[in-house]
Amino acid sequence: MSIDLNWETVTGGPDGQELADQIRDFIHTKFQSVPLPRFIKSVTVHDFQFGVIPPELELKDITDPLPDFYEDHVDSDVASDDSEGEEDAVDNNLAPPSQGERHQRTDDSEALGGDVRNLGHLPPHLMFGSPGGPGGPGMGSLRNGDMGSPFMRVSTPGIPGGTSNLHYFHSHLGGGLSGTQTPLAAVAGAQHLSTANWLEGHGHSSSVPNLTHFGNPGGAGTSPRRQPERNHSRNPSQGSISVADLNPNSLAPPSSSTLGVPSLKEKHSTTPAPGSATALSGSNEQQQQQQPQDNDDGHPRWREQRIDDMQAVFRIRYAGDVKLLLTADILLDYPMPSFVGIPVRLSITGLTFDGVGVLAKIRKRVHFCFLSPEDAAAAVGGDGEEGLSSPGEGPSQAQGQGQGQGQGQGQGQTPGAGQQKQQKKQAGWVGSGNTKLGGLLQEIRVESEIGQRESGRQSLKNVGKVERFVLEQVRRIFEEEFVYPSFWTFLV
């Protein structure tokens, strides 16, 4: 079934010009990565035009998409967005929190709900040592995941009267017990206690002094509960960071070299997005999420096949006036190697193409590629012999030419310019009973301009080599980028 293609609509207007510019830039980029021969200095692509002659399209078959089209490239720009809830996460480049994380944040908020409201009525040392205060289980034993939670933005009241007395109280009451210098006391009393001494006891268990002589704001003499002994983590409590921020002697938060802890990001006043991970918990979660992906590097992910996925197989024939303008600098070796470079202007004024293309529609993606000669012969089935004909000639003529080439000289054909032209088109074809396509690009017409001509020949001998090199690279770029298993994916 033939398909009429409105070539002017596809290639005309601003969209067509933008597409032509993108193709020009793509070819230019590919030429920059090609190793050039010694006699060529550089290759530059200047212009690309589609021309006015459209290709001929013929629908051959409608089948299921190729298996490779279902491969999900996680590291690509078009990662899987099949599920509805996954699209928002892909757009924001954020991973949604797990159910356990949301439950954990809810428990933390409930645990802090009653204590945070009464922090302002307690003395500073009791506030940091109470079970519900920042030094207790609610905040003092924060895990890595809680350090970046929105509750970090709760302002910690200042410590009136200075912090040296607090260190004096802890050091005398604790006596010779190891680990009584908590991170809060170490930061607050840094002028009396060196960092090295605090680090020596930082890894030991700590206990909070029994502050029985301090009461509640209401006057009830209930004593706070005693903290169970536990090992300190490498992360300082929130209170220690807040005290350092409020210390008038320091203008910057404590560094990792001073506290012996990993450097923390600056606290911001902005609230994290509901579906985003926090600063420090996100790093741990990303490591956990990336670990399964790293383990699956050798096993690609595959999207689920659906009944509405389809693939169309086309026979594409083209003998048009597509134009590609580029320049190549030829190096002259006289009077010394690479003495000077002379630009050579090469113009591709048209090409002849005959091949089989595949267009697959899978949900929001359209995949396109050309088939190799072997795959094309299998896809068109009984039309494999017809696939040898160039635009404008019938299957019988192409079959006769193939048999004639297999015998050395076609019978019944008069040698002449027309036959030489056909033989030039068939240069890469194997002439046997099992004839198949030898290359998708059958013919590329090139015009070169350089210097002056002498007796109809170029004045430089390397012009022919430059032409062959450019044509080989154009053919190689086409086959590597557009022929299956390589394919192009478009989002629709």
Swiss-Prot record:
Q: Which UniProt keywords apply?
A: Endoplasmic reticulum, Lipid transport, Lipid-binding, Membrane, Mitochondrion, Mitochondrion outer membrane, Transport
Top-level taxon of origin:
Eukaryota
Give the matching InterPro entries. Mdm12 (IPR027532), SMP_LBD (IPR031468)
Question: What membrane topology does the UniProt entry give?
Answer: Peripheral membrane protein
> May I ask which residue range the UniProt record assigns to the signal sequence?
none
Chain spans, region Disordered: 68-158, 199-301, 379-434
Write out the transmembrane intervals.
none
Q: Does the keyword Endoplasmic reticulum apply?
A: yes
GO MF term set: lipid binding
- SMP-LTD domain residues are 1-492
Biased composition range(s): Gly residues: 130-139, 401-415
**What CDD domains does the record point to?**
SMP_Mdm12 (cd21672)
Q: Name one GO biological process term.
A: protein insertion into mitochondrial outer membrane
Biased composition (Polar residues) is annotated at 270-285
Subcellular location per the Swiss-Prot or TrEMBL entry: Mitochondrion outer membrane; Endoplasmic reticulum membrane
Composition bias, Acidic residues? 78-90
Q: Name one GO cellular component term.
A: ERMES complex
Q: Where is the composition biased (Low complexity)?
A: 246-257, 387-400, 416-428
Subunit and interaction comment: Component of the ER-mitochondria encounter structure (ERMES) or MDM complex, composed of MMM1, MDM10, MDM12 and MDM34. A MMM1 homodimer associates with one molecule of MDM12 on each side in a pairwise head-to-tail manner, and the SMP-LTD domains of MMM1 and MDM12 generate a continuous hydrophobic tunnel for phospholipid trafficking.
The protein's job, in short, is: Component of the ERMES/MDM complex, which serves as a molecular tether to connect the endoplasmic reticulum (ER) and mitochondria. Components of this complex are involved in the control of mitochondrial shape and protein biogenesis, and function in nonvesicular lipid trafficking between the ER and mitochondria. MDM12 is required for the interaction of the ER-resident membrane protein MMM1 and the outer mitochondrial membrane-resident beta-barrel protein MDM10.
Instruction: Tell me which PANTHER family the record gives.
Output: MITOCHONDRIAL DISTRIBUTION AND MORPHOLOGY PROTEIN 12
Q: Which family does it belong to?
A: Belongs to the MDM12 family.
What name is this protein filed under? Answer: Mitochondrial distribution and morphology protein 12
